[in-house]
Amino acid sequence: MTESDARRDYRPGPLRHVEARPDGTRWALTFVRDFTHSPAALWTALTDPGELPQWAPYTADRNLGTVGPATLIMVDGQDRTELDGTVTRAESPHVLEHAWGEDVLLWTIEETDAGTRLTLRHTVDDQRTAAMTAAGWHMCLDVADSLLERNPIGPIVGAEAMNYGWRELNEQYSERLGVEPIDPTLR
């Protein structure tokens, strides 16, 4: 199957475990996803600037596998926005913590009998934003899984995600988190 065929046929997988809890003046979204891939393969997908643009909503100016300053370049169609991506923890292949602008992403990778469990803790502005964020990460991690399966789809991020089921995921995660969905086109 070609990348264009895989992309055309993409549909979001089932909802994943998600919760949002107060974290000081912000909210912490926790998103859990199981993969059949090794921790090392997942670590590479999370840290390698050659792999990030194939699935993530950003790329990086360097490998994120070491602590120190980094710049993340958020991608939405033709728009590029540079954000702080400073890595504060990098314990290969199990823990990665870095900034994404004002947010903090903490990725925890655990080996399981079936492969790997990835837990993402992402700080967001408010509880309603958590549902939007969960929908976005859901799609990105579906794409990462396909990439690791050697069946690349290509990134589905930003406004383009609307064409691939993002709105429905946003509504479903909003219901799961007990909040009203936000329409990002009205923000």
How would you name each of these model-derived features?
Residues 26, 78-80, 102-104:
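Glycine-centered tight beta-turn/hairpin loop motif at sheet-sheet or coil-to-beta transitions
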Residues 29-31, 83-85, 118:
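Hydrophobic residues positioned within well-ordered beta-strands of beta-sheet architectures
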Residues 43-46, 55, 72, 100-102, ...:
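Tryptophan-centric aromatic hotspots in well-structured domains and transmembrane helices
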Residues 34, 51-99, 180-187:
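Glycine-rich portal/gate segments that line the openings of hydrophobic small-molecule binding cavities
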Residues 13-18, 22-23, 88, 95-148:
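Beta-strand/loop substructures that line and gate deep hydrophobic ligand-binding cavities in soluble
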Residues 1-59, 185-187:
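Hydrophobic ligand-binding cavity/cleft-lining segments
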Residues 1-11, 124-186:
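A conserved amphipathic terminal alpha-helix motif
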